[in-house]
Swiss-Prot record:
This is Probable RNA polymerase sigma-C factor. InterPro entries: RNA_pol_sigma-70_dom (IPR014284), RNA_pol_sigma70 (IPR000943), RNA_pol_sigma70_r1_2 (IPR009042), RNA_pol_sigma70_r2 (IPR007627), RNA_pol_sigma70_r3 (IPR007624), RNA_pol_sigma70_r4 (IPR007630), RNA_pol_sigma_r2 (IPR013325), RNA_pol_sigma_r3/r4-like (IPR013324). It comes from Synechocystis sp. (strain ATCC 27184 / PCC 6803 / Kazusa). SUPFAM superfamilies: Sigma2 domain of RNA polymerase sigma factors, Sigma3 and sigma4 domains of RNA polymerase sigma factors. Transmembrane segments: none annotated. It holds the Pfam family Sigma70_r4. Sigma factors are initiation factors that promote the attachment of RNA polymerase to specific initiation sites and are then released. PANTHER family: RNA POLYMERASE SIGMA FACTOR RPO, RNA POLYMERASE SIGMA FACTOR RPOD. The lineage of its organism: Bacteria, Bacillati, Cyanobacteriota, Cyanophyceae, Synechococcales. Residues 362-381 bind DNA. Gene3D superfamilies: RNA Polymerase Primary Sigma Factor, Winged helix-like DNA-binding domain superfamily/Winged helix DNA-binding domain. CDD domains: Sigma70_r4. The keyword Methyltransferase does not apply.
Length: 404
């Protein structure tokens, strides 16, 4: 864990600025209509003042030059490789698992309290003595360093540099978040909330950026920022009242329908869609029954009713950012698949089109591998169970929320 710098950093959370602005008192002698108008005006002015202060704050941070960007990204990746070693070991190494549990509790307390917890409070939550907690941290850090082939001092230096570099990269690109967020105003969320969600997307971009690929970070991070913002609009706004998991299933069904239609030249039946997705026909019908049938895609939505519903739904158009993300997804998937057996790798690669870009049905895979459809299903189920482990699942989850 890294000690905070003595320098006061620019605020990355726009809501942190709220305490800096005084609220004006309402005119209690006004009638109810005037009070409502005054309240709305105050909220609008309050939001404008927050954005202005936020822009002034991040405007003091210099943009990164290309060589600085590469150097900082390398420090982040060096640290994240150590984190990956730790995560892999936690599945079977007791010392690492206990260390991770202790750190997770520390981080939760840090968020709740707003400051670092005392060892006494930290140990109490874990049900340990302070001495036991300190030994857990020492043993876990030592084991982590051993697995990484480093001394504890070397590991802590890389950890400190990586955490500092990650924060630096985020702060240096907050202006891009504001720029993207402004494009999605008046769609159900305030600009401040859009900036907040975009910043979370930026953080994901910093974690996944590979400086050896040759493209600029701004190009790469644009997709992640946009992904964070558009997902927040779909999830939190009141324009579309479908749960996120239903929306995701609908998108999968839509893609399957499109694929079958292109391959077979007819409108797919529910049974065909179900087989393609590994679902039962009843499950597909259940999802489809939750779609409002009377809503026009030309329906005007948003605060000013100037956005069509179609604008918020997926399209078949591939942007350069989407193509870049597909390449990144392929790279991440190749690494994740190494955790599977060779036969499981074959089945998953064919099922999701990782080999030739064509996603095959269970029956097709069975013919290719000379296996029964049921055997292919069993292999796929076992492989997917492994891939659902949080360490692997979280690595690719965000891709599938926006990529088809």
């Amino acid at each position: 864990m890294t000690k905070p710098s003595n320098d006061e950093p620019p605020l990355t959370n726009v809501r942190d600025l709220e305490a800096m602005l005084p609220l004006e008192e309402e005119d209690l002698t006004a009638d109810s209509q005037d009070l409502e108008y005054t309240a709305v005006a105050h909220r609008q002015q309050f939001s404008t003042d927050l954005v202005r202060l936020y822009l002034q704050d991040i405007g003091r941070i210099p943009l990164l030059k290309r060589d600085e960007e590469v150097h900082i990204a390398q420090q982040v990746q060096s640290y994240l490789r150590l984190v990956e070693i730790q995560n892999r070991a936690a599945e079977s190494d007791a010392a690492i698992d206990q260390y991770q549990t202790a750190i997770a509790v520390h981080d939760q307390l840090l968020v709740q309290l707003g400051h670092r917890p005392s060892y006494e409070r930290w140990a109490k939550i874990l049900g340990q003595t302070v001495a036991t907690l300190k030994q857990t941290l020492k043993s876990g850090k030592k084991r982590w360093a051993e697995l990484a082939g480093l001394t504890v001092e070397e590991l802590e230096n890389i950890e400190k540099q990586g955490i500092t570099a990650k924060a630096h990269m985020i702060k240096a690109n907050l202006r891009l978040v504001v720029s993207v967020a402004k494009k999605y105003q008046n769609r159900g969320l305030e600009l401040l909330d859009l900036i907040q969600e975009g910043t979370l997307g930026l953080e994901r971009a910093v974690e996944k950026f590979d400086p050896t690929k040759g493209y600029r970070f701004s190009t790469y991070s644009y997709w992640w920022i946009r992904q964070g913002i558009t997902r927040a609009i779909a999830t939190q706004s009141r324009m579309i009242r479908l749960p996120v998991h239903i929306t995701e299933k609908l998108n999968k069904i839509k893609r399957a329908q499109r694929k079958i239609s292109q391959e077979k030249g007819h409108t797919p039946k529910i049974d065909e869609v179900a087989e393609e997705l590994g679902m039962t026909p009843e499950q597909v019908r259940e999802v489809l029954t939750q779609v409002p049938r009377s809503v026009s895609l030309e329906l005007k939505v948003g605060q000013d009713k100037d956005t069509e519903l179609m604008d918020l739904l997926e399209t078949d158009t591939q942007s350069p950012e989407d193509e870049l993300m597909r390449e990144a997804l392929q790279n991440d998937m190749q690494e994740i698949l190494l955790d599977l057996t060779p036969r499981e790798q074959e089945v998953i690669a064919l099922r999701f089109g990782f080999q030739d870009g064509v996603a095959h049905s269970l029956s097709e895979i069975g013919r290719i591998l000379n296996l029964s459809r049921e055997r292919v299903r069993q292999i796929e189920a076992k492989a997917l169970q492994k891939l659902r482990h949080p360490r692997r699942r979280d690595r690719i989850r965000d891709y599938y929320e926006n990529l088809g």
